[in-house]
C-alpha cells in the first residue's frame, strides 16, 4: 500500500481500537481485500433513480398510481426495451400489468383465449424488462429485492442470456415449467413487483401526506413497506404529528379540517378516533344554530341534509374550542409573538362585532353559546371533558401512533441528499432577502440552525414523555410550526381561520406570504441558502413543495434559472381548477433531472380495466454527457470512507499491528 507508509503510520495507530473492531468483520487480508474490490466495483455502477413527490394531501388513488408507474419511468423503460417491436396497445397493457398484476391477471384470465401462449410471451417480456432495470445494481442488491418463493429462478433468468444457443434450451425450459406447474400467475406478480421496486432506488416525499383527502393512512401504510424512503415533513403532517403527541390545539385543528372537507374516513375508519362525544356536544350546544358558515366543502361526496347539518354543528363546535386552546398557547408563549391572533376577547357579543387591528367589523355569525366574555379562552366543563376524551382517542390509537413513529423515524424538516436540498415550505427571510432571525428558548437562530432546532423540538414533543416541561414546549412548537409567523412549514405571516368563518370582508382573509416566495426566482437567494446549508451552489438544487404551481396562469415550476424546483404534486382536487394540471414530480437518474407534469388521474379501476394511465409530459432539466455513478453520490462518499478504513486495516495486518485470524478458525 502506498497510502500509508512509515511517515503516516501514526494514523493507523491512532485508529487501532476501531480497526480491531473492524477486523472482527474482516478477519483476514483476503476478506478485507475482497470487500475493497466489491466496494470499488459498486462505485462505478450508474447512480440509482430518485423519485420526488410532494403534497399528496391524502389522495391515495392518484398517489398509489404515481408510486406504481414511477412518474412514467416504467413506461419509458418499456419504450427503451421494446421500441417499435410492440404495438402501443401492447405496451400499455404490459405497463398496466406491472402496476396492478393481481387485478390485471384476473381480467386477462377471463378474456384471453390462449392463456398458455399469453403467459409465455408475457414472461419473456417481463424477464427482459427486469434484466434492464436490474442492470445498474449489484447481484447482491438485486437478490435482496427478490421474493423468497422465486428468488433462485428469477436470479437464474436475469443472469442468463436467452439468445445464447447453449443456454437457450435451459432458459426456455424454466419458463415452460413455470407455466406447466400452474405458477405463471404467481411468477408474473412476483416479477412485476420486483420491477416496481428496482425502477426507483430512492423515494423522497416532500411533505403533506395528510390533509383533506380520504386516505392518508392508506398512503402511510404503503410508504412503510417501501424499501428506501425519506420524508420532509409538511405543515399538514406536523399538525397530525402534534395531535398524536397529545397537543390539544393540534387535535382540534386536525378534526376541524376533516370536518371542513367532510373527510372523516381517516379519523374514524383509519385510526378509530371516536367522534361521537363531539357530535353529542355539538347537538347540545348548537341545536338551533344552522351553522351556515361551517357547512362542509364537498367534492365528489353525496351527503344528505341531515349529515350536512350534523357535520356543520360539529365543525363550529370544534372551531370555537380550537380558538380557545390556541389562545392558551399564545398567552403561555409570548416569544411566539402571536398576540394579534387573540381574537375571542375582541368580540362584542351584544353588538355582534369584532375589533380587529383597531377597526370594527360586523360578525356574520354571533352565536357563541360556550363563550364566557369574562374568560373567553377558558373551556367550560363540557368542553374540557370533550377535549380530554378526544386527546385520549388520539394518544391511544395504535395505528395512528405507529404511523406517526414512521414519520419521525423516516422524516425531518429538511434533507441534504446528493447535492440537493429538500424541504416542504420555505427558509424564513426578511423583506430584504436576508435570513430571518428567530428567538427560541433564549437562542437567536436563522437558516439551518433554526431548522435544526425546530426539528429537535418536534421530536421532544413526541418522545420526551418523562420531561413534561420540555414535552409541553415541544407540543406548543408543533402548533407554531403549523401556523406560526416564522414557521418554515407554514410560510405566512398569519393564518386567518377565524376571519374566514366570521367576517365578510375578504381583505381580512388575506394571508401574507413570507418574503422567501418573493425571492424564489432569485439566483442570489438560492446561492445564499446553498452556502447556509454547506452545498455547492453550482451543482445543487432546492426541491420545494407547499405552494401549488399555477400552470394555467403561465407560472413555471423551474425557478432561479433551474436552481429551485417547485413540485407541489397537485394531487389535491380542490387546487386543480386553479393550477390547470395535477402537478409535478421529479426524477433524478444517472442521466440527469426530468421534471414531469401530470394530468388529473381518473381512478385505479379505470387504470386496470381500460389501461388508463396518468397523462404526463416530461421536460429534461439537465442532461449529463457521462452518466453519474455511485461514485458521485452521498452513498459513494460513504463507500469511499469504508474503502479508506479497509485500506488502513490491510496495512495494520501487513505491519503486524493486528494479527489475522487463522483460516481454520474463520471457517469453523
UniProtKB/Swiss-Prot annotation:
Pathway entry: Carbohydrate biosynthesis; gluconeogenesis
Catalytic EC class: hydrolase
Parts of the chain that traverse the membrane: none
One function term, GO molecular function aspect: fructose 1,6-bisphosphate 1-phosphatase activity
GO terms (BP aspect): gluconeogenesis
EC number annotated for this UniProt entry: 3.1.3.11
Disulfide-bond pairs as recorded: none
Catalytic reactions on record: beta-D-fructose 1,6-bisphosphate + H2O = beta-D-fructose 6-phosphate + phosphate
Pfam families xref list: FBPase_2
Keywords for this protein: Carbohydrate metabolism, Hydrolase, Manganese
InterPro entries xrefs: FBPtase_class3, Metallo-depent_PP-like
Superkingdom per UniProt: Bacteria
Entry cofactors: Mn(2+)
Family: Belongs to the FBPase class 3 family.
Protein name, as recorded: Fructose-1,6-bisphosphatase class 3
Organism in which the protein naturally occurs: Clostridium botulinum (strain 657 / Type Ba4)
Amino acid at each position: 500500500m502506498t497510502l500509508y507508509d512509515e511517515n503516516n503510520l501514526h494514523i493507523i495507530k491512532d485508529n487501532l481500537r476501531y480497526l480491531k473492531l473492524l477486523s472482527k468483520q474482516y478477519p483476514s487480508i483476503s476478506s478485507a481485500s475482497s470487500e475493497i474490490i466489491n466496494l470499488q466495483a459498486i462505485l462505478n455502477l450508474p447512480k440509482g433513480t430518485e423519485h420526488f413527490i410532494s403534497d399528496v394531501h391524502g389522495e391515495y388513488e392518484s398517489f398509489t398510481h404515481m408510486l406504481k408507474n414511477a412518474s412514467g419511468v416504467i413506461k419509458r423503460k418499456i419504450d427503451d426495451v421494446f421500441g417499435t417491436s410492440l404495438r402501443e396497445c401492447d405496451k400499455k397493457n404490459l405497463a398496466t400489468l406491472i402496476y396492478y398484476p393481481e387485478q390485471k391477471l384476473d381480467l386477462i384470465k377471463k378474456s384471453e383465449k390462449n392463456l398458455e401462449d399469453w403467459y409465455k410471451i408475457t414472461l419473456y417480456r417481463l424477464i427482459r424488462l427486469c434484466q434492464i432495470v436490474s442492470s445498474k445494481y449489484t447481484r447482491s442488491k438485486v437478490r435482496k429485492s427478490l421474493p423468497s418463493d422465486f428468488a433462485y429462478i428469477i436470479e437464474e433468468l436475469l443472469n442468463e442470456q436467452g439468445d445464447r444457443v447453449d443456454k437457450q434450451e435451459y432458459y426456455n425450459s424454466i419458463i415452460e415449467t413455470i407455466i406447466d406447474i400452474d405458477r405463471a400467475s404467481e411468477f408474473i406478480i412476483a416479477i412485476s413487483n420486483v420491477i416496481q421496486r428496482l425502477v426507483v432506488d430512492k423515494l423522497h416525499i416532500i411533505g403533506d401526506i395528510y390533509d383533506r383527502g380520504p386516505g392518508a393512512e392508506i398512503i402511510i401504510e404503503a410508504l412503510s413497506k417501501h424499501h428506501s424512503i425519506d420524508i420532509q415533513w409538511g405543515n399538514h403532517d406536523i399538525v397530525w404529528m402534534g395531535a398524536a403527541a397529545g397537543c390539544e390545539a393540534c387535535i382540534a385543528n386536525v378534526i376541524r379540517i376533516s370536518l371542513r372537507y367532510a373527510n372523516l374516513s381517516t379519523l374514524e375508519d383509519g385510526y378509530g378516533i371516536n367522534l361521537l362525544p363531539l357530535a353529542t356536544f355539538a347537538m347540545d350546544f348548537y341545536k338551533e344554530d344552522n351553522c351556515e358558515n361551517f357547512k362542509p366543502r364537498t367534492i365528489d361526496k353525496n351527503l344528505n341534509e341531515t349529515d350536512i347539518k350534523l357535520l356543520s354543528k360539529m365543525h363550529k363546535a370544534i372551531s370555537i374550542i380550537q380558538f380557545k386552546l390556541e389562545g392558551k398557547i399564545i398567552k403561555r408563549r409570548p416569544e411566539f409573538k402571536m398576540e394579534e391572533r387573540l381574537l375571542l376577547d375582541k368580540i362584542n357579543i351584544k353588538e355582534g362585532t369584532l375589533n380587529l387591528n383597531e377597526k370594527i367589523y360586523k360578525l356574520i355569525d354571533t352565536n357563541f353559546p360556550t363563550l364566557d366574555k369574562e374568560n373567553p379562552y377558558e373551556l367550560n366543563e363540557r368542553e374540557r371533558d370533550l377535549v380530554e376524551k378526544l386527546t385520549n382517542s388520539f394518544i391511544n390509537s395504535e395505528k395512528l401512533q405507529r404511523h406517526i413513529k414512521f414519520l419521525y423515524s423516516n422524516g425531518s424538516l429538511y434533507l441534504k441528499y446528493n447535492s440537493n436540498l429538500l424541504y416542504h415550505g420555505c427558509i424564513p427571510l426578511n423583506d430584504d432577502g436576508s435570513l430571518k432571525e428567530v428567538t427560541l428558548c433564549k437562542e437567536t437562530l436563522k437558516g439551518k440552525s433554526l431548522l435544526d432546532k425546530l426539528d429537535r423540538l418536534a421530536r421532544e414533543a413526541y418522545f420526551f414523555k418523562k420531561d413534561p416541561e420540555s414535552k409541553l414546549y415541544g407540543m406548543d412548537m408543533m402548533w407554531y410550526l403549523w401556523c406560526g409567523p416564522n414557521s418554515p412549514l407554514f410560510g405566512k405571516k398569519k393564518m386567518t381561520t377565524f376571519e374566514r368563518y366570521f367576517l365578510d370582508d375578504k381583505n381580512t382573509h388575506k394571508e401574507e406570504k413570507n418574503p422567501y416566495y418573493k425571492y424564489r426566482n432569485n439566483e442570489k437567494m438560492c446561492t445564499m441558502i446553498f452556502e447556509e446549508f454547506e452545498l455547492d451552489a453550482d451543482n445543487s438544487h432546492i426541491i420545494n413543495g407547499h405552494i401549488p404551481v399555477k400552470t394555467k396562469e403561465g407560472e413555471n415550476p423551474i425557478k432561479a434559472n433551474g436552481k429551485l424546483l417547485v413540485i407541489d404534486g397537485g394531487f389535491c382536487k380542490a387546487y386543480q381548477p386553479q393550477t390547470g394540471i395535477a402537478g409535478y414530480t421529479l426524477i433524478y437518474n444517472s442521466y440527469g433531472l426530468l421534471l414531469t407534469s401530470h394530468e388529473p388521474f381518473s381512478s385505479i379501476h379505470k387504470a386496470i380495466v381500460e389501461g388508463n394511465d396518468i397523462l404526463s409530459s416530461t421536460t429534461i432539466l439537465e442532461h449529463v454527457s457521462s452518466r453519474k455513478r455511485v461514485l458521485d453520490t452521498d452513498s459513494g462518499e460513504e463507500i469511499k470512507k469504508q474503502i479508506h478504513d479497509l485500506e488502513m486495516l490491510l496495512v495494520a495486518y501487513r505491519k503486524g499491528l493486528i494479527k489475522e485470524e487463522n483460516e481454520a478458525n474463520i471457517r469453523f
